[in-house]
């Protein structure tokens, strides 16, 4: 085996390491191994260009001086995709090393953490798994009705729908009503037992569903999953349709073609890596936003948080000064319009039965809310949480859920701000260098009638500029997540347009329609997943706003109860079950 083949197989080694590294090691360990393996493959391609190894097809068709031989490594389709993968693996390593997740060891609930690419690979092998169902049904085996990805999706859907009990899917598992109870799910008709012992390895397809505490500790791993999942796709795309170590079937001592003289420019040699670095940084921001949406959808409606919120609201009602005993959470979690069916609050005291008195006090309660008597307390508490990112576990006494303030803390949106600034800076440098090249190579008109391929990098720059103005806000809004997602999707769309033949240019890579099909499917997949997650997040946000309206009415009643208690300290009958 030659040294060139060793460089070729190092890319396979990087993918293998990402799957099978020891789970007792931190996630940065596996990301570092994948980074060094891809770097070795990239250095091998660079060595082929520098040494004029004419056995490689890309070297044979791109003869140039020494400096442009180095830049010729990424001046073709195969080398540019390999550079993309290497930068993405490097960014993933930085994310792992900076995050330093502390929950990489064995879980207390049993089972090891999943591998980096586990959930992402299931998207690609889902069709293959479903194709096995026909074979199992023909052989009279128990059919597997659901893939792990579908099961995990149903688990999250069950957690989101625990409030209204409107889950229409199969009852795969029952979510616990209390945090101390374990929750798990298994395959329908699975023949392997689930290992429930602590510290033992659990079969991947029969893993335990995590509660809110364990889900919060795995946020860092979910961020890394998305980044290395994108690297996985581009690696498979590179090996399937864009092999960068294509060998010639004949011996040749001299190159057959020269590199395009228009591309032999020192500015244009530095321009592509800057554009790729900016595009890959947008991919990291996309992964962070995807992780935030996936965790936010489940966290806002998990049963333990609803129980904690109910207890806090009950203590708030007790502190109003009109209740002499503790109110249970089951009583307060009922809808406010149904409270009157089971209890008689202080609104029905004998001294307060006058409709005019009720109307006057209700108006007085709403006026207090309008002036900020109760809302200001929640705002000040939220400001303290947002300004101090380290204390992200603090919650407002008037918040509707225990996890509402932790979602919008500065500590959570700091990585998004860093990566979107990185994307914007690299795109700035790349676009300025490309504009300079177009000016002195194509004339003054080249500055305005720019190359259409370079315009593909201008769309992400505009969106990144808009995202910078949105991410500097103290709270992380949904528009920030949407702009981050669309920025990465524009990068993928620009890559597809360049490498599929939609845009004709001097340095386009349109040589095969198969590459465009791969990239188009990847673009549709990322767009579909992003829109589904974003729509679910907005749906949960609308439920939250509806619940907040109910809480406004409840808090106004608390103000009325306080004044009623002052008017009559000892009521005859306050609550009746």
From Swiss-Prot:
The lineage of its organism: Eukaryota, Viridiplantae, Streptophyta, Embryophyta, Tracheophyta. It is found in: Mitochondrion. GO terms for cellular component: membrane; mitochondrion. This is Probable cytochrome c biosynthesis protein. Keywords: Cytochrome c-type biogenesis, Mitochondrion. One of its GO terms (biological process) is cytochrome complex assembly. Could be involved in assembly and maturation of cytochromes c. May play a role in guidance of apocytochromes and heme groups for the covalent linkage introduced by the cytochrome-c-heme lyase. The keyword Isomerase does not apply. GO terms for molecular function: heme binding; heme transmembrane transporter activity. It comes from the Eukaryota. InterPro entries: Cyt_c_assembly, Cyt_c_biogenesis, Cyt_c_biogenesis_plant. Pfam families: Cytochrom_C_asm (PF01578). It comes from Oenothera berteroana. PANTHER family: CYTOCHROME C ASSEMBLY PROTEIN-RELATED, CYTOCHROME C-TYPE BIOGENESIS PROTEIN CCMF. Belongs to the CcmF/CycK/Ccl1/NrfE/CcsA family.
């Amino acid at each position: 085996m030659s040294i060139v083949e060793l460089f070729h197989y190092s890319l396979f080694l990087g993918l293998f390491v990402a799957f099978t590294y020891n789970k007792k090691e931190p996630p940065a360990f596996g990301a570092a191994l994948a980074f060094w393996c891809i770097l070795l493959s990239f250095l091998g391609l660079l060595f082929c260009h520098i040494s004029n190894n004419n056995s490689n097809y890309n070297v044979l068709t791109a003869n140039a001086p020494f400096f442009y031989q180095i830049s010729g490594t990424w001046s073709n389709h195969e080398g540019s995709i390999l550079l993309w993968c290497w930068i993405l693996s490097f960014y993933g390593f930085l994310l792992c090393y900076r995050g330093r997740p502390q929950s990489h060891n064995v879980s207390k609930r049993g089972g090891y953490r999943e591998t980096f690419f586990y959930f992402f690979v299931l998207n690609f092998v889902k069709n293959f798994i479903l194709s096995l169902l026909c074979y199992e049904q023909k052989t009279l085996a128990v059919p597997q009705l659901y893939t792990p990805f579908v099961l995990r999706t149903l688990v999250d859907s069950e957690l989101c729908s625990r409030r209204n009990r409107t889950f229409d899917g199969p009852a795969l598992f029952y979510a616990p009503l209390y945090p101390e109870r374990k929750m798990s799910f298994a395959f329908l008709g699975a023949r392997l037992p689930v290992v429930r012992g602590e510290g033992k390895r659990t079969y991947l397809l029969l893993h335990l569903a995590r509660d809110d505490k364990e889900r919060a500790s795995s946020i860092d791993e979910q961020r890394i999953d998305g980044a290395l999942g994108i690297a996985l796709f581009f690696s498979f795309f590179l090996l399937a349709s864009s092999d960068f170590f294509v060998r010639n079937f004949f011996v040749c001592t001299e190159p057959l073609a020269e590199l395009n003289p228009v591309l032999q420019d020192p500015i244009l040699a530095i321009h592509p890596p800057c554009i790729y670095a900016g595009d890959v940084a947008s991919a990291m921001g996309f992964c962070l936003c995807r992780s935030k949406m996936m965790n936010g959808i489940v966290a806002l409606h998990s049963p333990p948080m609803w129980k904690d919120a109910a207890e806090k609201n009950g203590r708030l009602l007790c502190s109003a000064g009109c209740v002499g005993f503790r109110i249970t959470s089951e009583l307060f979690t009922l809808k406010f319009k149904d409270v009157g069916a089971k209890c008689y609050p202080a609104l029905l005291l004998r001294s307060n039965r006058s409709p005019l008195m009720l109307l006057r006090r209700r108006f007085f309660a709403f006026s207090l809310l309008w002036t900020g008597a109760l809302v200001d307390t929640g705002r000040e508490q939220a400001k303290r949480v947002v300004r101090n990112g380290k204390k992200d576990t603090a919650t407002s006494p008037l918040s509707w859920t225990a996890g509402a303030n932790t979602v919008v803390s500065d500590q959570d949106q700091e990585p998004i701000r860093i990566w979107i600034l990185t994307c914007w800076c690299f795109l700035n440098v790349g676009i300025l260098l490309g504009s300079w090249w177009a000016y002195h190579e194509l004339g003054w008109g080249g500055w305005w009638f720019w190359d259409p391929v370079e315009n593909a990098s201008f769309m992400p720059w505009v969106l990144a500029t808009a995202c910078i103005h949105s991410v500097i806000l103290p709270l992380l809004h949904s528009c920030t997540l949407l702009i981050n997602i669309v920025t990465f999707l524009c990068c993928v769309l620009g890559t597809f347009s360049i490498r599929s033949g939609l845009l004709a240019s001097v340095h386009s890579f349109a040589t095969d329609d198969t590459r465009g099909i791969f990239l188009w499917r990847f673009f549709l997949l990322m767009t579909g997943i992003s829109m589904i997650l974003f729509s679910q997040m907005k749906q949960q946000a609308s439920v939250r706003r509806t619940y907040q309206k109910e809480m406004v009415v409840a808090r106004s009643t608390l103000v009325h109860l306080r004044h009623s208690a002052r008017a009559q300290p000892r009521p005859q009958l306050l609550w009746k079950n």
